[in-house]
Amino acid sequence: MDLRPCAPAESRKRTEYSDRQECQKGKDMIRKAVFQDEEQIAVVYEKARAYMAEHGNPNQWGRTFPPRELTHEDIEKGILYVLEEQGEVHGAFMFEIGEDPTYHVISEGAWKSDEPYGVIHRVASDGKVHGLMKETVAFCSSQISHLRMDTHEKNLTMQHQLLRNGFEYCGVILTHDHTPRLAYEKL
């Protein structure tokens, strides 16, 4: 896949694909999600939940995470991105530059840097397009080189992908509901 970051449109409405022409190179692209993507994103999340359950991780997202309200809110904030191929959404992730409150306290280790960072959450794929994590990391790294992520201890696929894509294990953080997550960082 040949993807490049989308330049933000100043007066973009979240109901239009206003950055499609700027971002597309070849047939694949990463772009900001818009409200029309919500149904396809819900399908991607459903497939990701099924994959996690089949691979020994049924509890990280359960049966309903992320809720549609969170997807809608992320689109509204302009922090939800999709991987699109030939007009179909095959992956999604949340990316935001700035502090994540759940990363303020880390145990069983330490962060490598206190410099500003971008955080990636809720990476999901429908399994039809390979290389989503690589493209996600490349896209986010083009925005800010310092990245942080976390994952469930039973999400072995994501742990492998994080290490494969240059992240280092740093310790354990607690989510908003106080469940532990393995924390990773890429400088």
Language-model region placement:
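A short helix-loop-beta-strand connector motif used in the catalytic cores of GNAT acetyltransferases and
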Residues: 70-82, 99-101
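Conserved beta-strand in the GNAT
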Residues: 82, 88-98
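Conserved catalytic-core motifs of GNAT/GCN5-like acyltransferases
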Residues: 150, 168-182
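A short beta-loop-alpha structural element at the N-terminal edge
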Residues: 29-43
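Conserved GNAT-fold acetyl-CoA-binding loop/helix
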Residues: 49-69
